[in-house]
């Protein structure tokens, strides 16, 4: 059986670097980022330098692709123009290129920051309204909406993964609730690329965490079975947390320090707000 060809943008980043060895045996990977190719390409990998803000560079990138894992874009908070260029305009550019190439599947790396202003005391699923905690979070909420549009309008099959924190182990108390081992993310991405019944699925990128703030039933219904748990790393996470100290705003909300940055709102009102369901 011929392996599918999957484009991975943002392949030079931390998440892409962790995913590559976990997906390379299953797919032919076309890796892409703005810089030159790394020195460790595998036989099933090739590199295409491209920029999300340059549409002309994206058509040859997507040519012949069966699927797209879109990790590219600006990955931290910044001013609006800095975030919007790659994360909003760039996302539309790569989605349009995927559509033009006949690419059937898209995995969009959304983020927990699309819902970061929910209190830590509230367990949420994927049917609550978005509550972004930053311009970065706004761009991820936009990305989910754009994937929904492409699924409905052009019959592309999309999965938006609200990634918590991808690492070999969680690094603080907050991450005990949102952490996902790279093995589990690779499993979830594979489901998004291969499950026959996906239209546009929104799921959480999290492992089997006892302290989870999220109901990940949408992922479980698709067959996701995480093999890792943050509880196996509690001692390390809490030791690291002790070095950080308290954050008066961030410790109340799921988005943490993203919520606290430049905060001038009403904490009580935000904690008690009940947004209408979308």
Predicted regions: what is each one?
Residues 208-225, 240-268, 272-273:
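Conserved C-terminal active-site "lid" loop/helix of NAD(P)H-dependent oxidoreductases
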Residues 45, 49-86:
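NAD(P)H-binding glycine-rich loop region in Rossmannoid oxidoreductase-like domains
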Residues 4-25:
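N-terminal Rossmann NAD(P)H-binding glycine-rich loop of SDR-like oxidoreductase domains
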Residues 27-38:
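Conserved glycine-rich Rossmann-like NAD(P)H-binding loop of the short-chain dehydrogenase/reductase
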Residues 163-169, 179-201, 208:
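Alpha-helical substrate-binding/gating segment
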Residues 85, 119-155:
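Catalytic helix-loop patch of NAD(P)-dependent Rossmann-fold dehydrogenases
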Residues 93-131:
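Conserved Rossmann-fold NAD(P)-dependent oxidoreductase catalytic core, especially the SDR/UDP-sugar
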Residues 53, 82-93, 101, 112, ...:
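Glycine-rich NAD(P)-binding loop of the Rossmann-fold in SDR/ketoreductase-type enzymes
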């Amino acid at each position: 059986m011929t392996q599918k060809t999957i484009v991975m943008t943002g392949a030079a980043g931390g998440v892409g670097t962790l995913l590559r060895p976990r997906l390379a045996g299953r797919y032919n990977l076309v890796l892409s980022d703005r810089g030159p190719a790394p020195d460790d390409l595998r036989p099933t990998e090739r590199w295409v330098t491209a920029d999300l803000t340059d549409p002309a560079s994206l058509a040859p990138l997507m040519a012949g692709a069966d699927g797209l894992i879109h990790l590219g874009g600006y990955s931290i908070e910044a001013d609006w123009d800095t975030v919007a260029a790659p994360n909003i305009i760039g996302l539309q550019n790569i989605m349009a290129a995927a559509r033009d190439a006949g690419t059937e599947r898209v995995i969009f790396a959304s983020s927990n920051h699309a819902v970061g202003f929910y209190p830590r005391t509230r367990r949420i699923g994927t049917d609550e309204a978005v509550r972004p905690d930053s311009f970065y979070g706004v761009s991820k909420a936009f990305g989910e909406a754009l994937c929904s549009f492409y699924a409905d309008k052009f019959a592309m099959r999309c999965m938006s993964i609200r990634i918590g924190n991808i690492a070999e182990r969680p690094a603080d108390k907050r991450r005990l609730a949102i952490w996902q081992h790279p093995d589990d993310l690779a499993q979830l991405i594979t489901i998004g690329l291969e499950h026959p019944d996906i239209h546009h699925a929104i799921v959480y990128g999290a492992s089997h965490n006892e302290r989870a703030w999220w109901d990940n039933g949408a992922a479980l219904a698709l067959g996701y079975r995480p093999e890792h748990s943050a509880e196996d790393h509690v001692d390390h996470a809490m030791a690291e947390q002790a070095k950080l100290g308290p954050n008066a705003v961030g410790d109340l909300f799921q988005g943490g320090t993203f919520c606290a940055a430049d905060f001038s709102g009403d904490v009580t009102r935000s904690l008690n707000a009940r947004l209408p369901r979308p």
